[in-house]
């Protein structure tokens, strides 16, 4: 799997997946070369599918997202994780305000319930950043729960500006309409992340072609 973005300075550090098929709270830490090793039927392919699913979800229109949250073959059926929401998180390093900065973005949604009426809604979203310097801490600029969606509108403000958003919409998409936000470049980077999933065993030429692009 190869990761790409518009900003060549972006360096993806880790990916978090939860609530997808048999995947529970899994964190992949990425280096230049990373391997996923496990016994057969332990979910290696599901982990890759989950990352591809998250990328598709991130870039889809609300109507398509509604269908994705209702796709039963991907909903966890193991009793231990059957009620877990889908969670995707990505941590990356980039240049922001002329400083090397660590950024963490995540979203979560509730899978459709058995009755087909409840669930199928985005229930959480967060974006925070931390300059890579001494004593720095993460600062939240997007925060969303089931009941409220907040964002920070200025460098000196707080993450307390409420915005209306649909249950199938993502703040990181909607806020691209506010091109005066001081963190607009971070939003743009997240919206342009691309995971190239390549089966190099069946088609190795695709892998080399992807890397050379």
State the predicted function of each range.
Residues 48-115:
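Conserved P-loop NTP-binding catalytic core
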